[in-house]
Amino acid sequence: MTIDRTYPIFTVRWLAVHGLAVPTVFFLGSISAMQFIQR
């Protein structure tokens, strides 16, 4: 009842957090890997 109402908000928030976190982690990981490879 209250779960049915808060569930879509939680999923949208979860998608927004992961949508921003995944590219950020991948971007930082690629930058650090490039710096380690160059040196």
From Swiss-Prot:
Cofactor note: With its partner (PsbE) binds heme. PSII binds additional chlorophylls, carotenoids and specific lipids.
Major subcellular site: plastid
An annotated Gene Ontology molecular function: heme binding
Cleavable signal peptide: none
Membrane topology label: Single-pass membrane protein
Keyword set includes Iron: yes
InterPro entries attached to this UniProt entry: PSII_cyt_b559_bsu, PSII_cyt_b559_CS, PSII_cyt_b559_N
GO cellular component: chloroplast thylakoid membrane; photosystem II reaction center; plastid
Annotated binding of heme, by residue: 18
Keyword Phosphoprotein appears in the UniProt entry: no
Localisation: Plastid, Chloroplast thylakoid membrane
Keyword terms of this UniProt record: Chloroplast, Electron transport, Heme, Iron, Membrane, Metal-binding, Photosynthesis, Photosystem II, Plastid, Thylakoid, Transmembrane, Transmembrane helix, Transport
Cofactor: heme b
Domain of life: Eukaryota
Gene Ontology biological process terms from the UniProt entry: photosynthetic electron transport chain
Residues spanning the membrane: 14-30
Pfam families, alphabetized: Cytochrom_B559 (PF00283)
Protein family according to the UniProt entry: Belongs to the PsbE/PsbF family.
Subunit-structure text: Heterodimer of an alpha subunit and a beta subunit. PSII is composed of 1 copy each of membrane proteins PsbA, PsbB, PsbC, PsbD, PsbE, PsbF, PsbH, PsbI, PsbJ, PsbK, PsbL, PsbM, PsbT, PsbX, PsbY, PsbZ, Psb30/Ycf12, at least 3 peripheral proteins of the oxygen-evolving complex and a large number of cofactors. It forms dimeric complexes.
Annotated function: This b-type cytochrome is tightly associated with the reaction center of photosystem II (PSII). PSII is a light-driven water:plastoquinone oxidoreductase that uses light energy to abstract electrons from H(2)O, generating O(2) and a proton gradient subsequently used for ATP formation. It consists of a core antenna complex that captures photons, and an electron transfer chain that converts photonic excitation into a charge separation.
Name listed for the protein in its UniProt record: Cytochrome b559 subunit beta
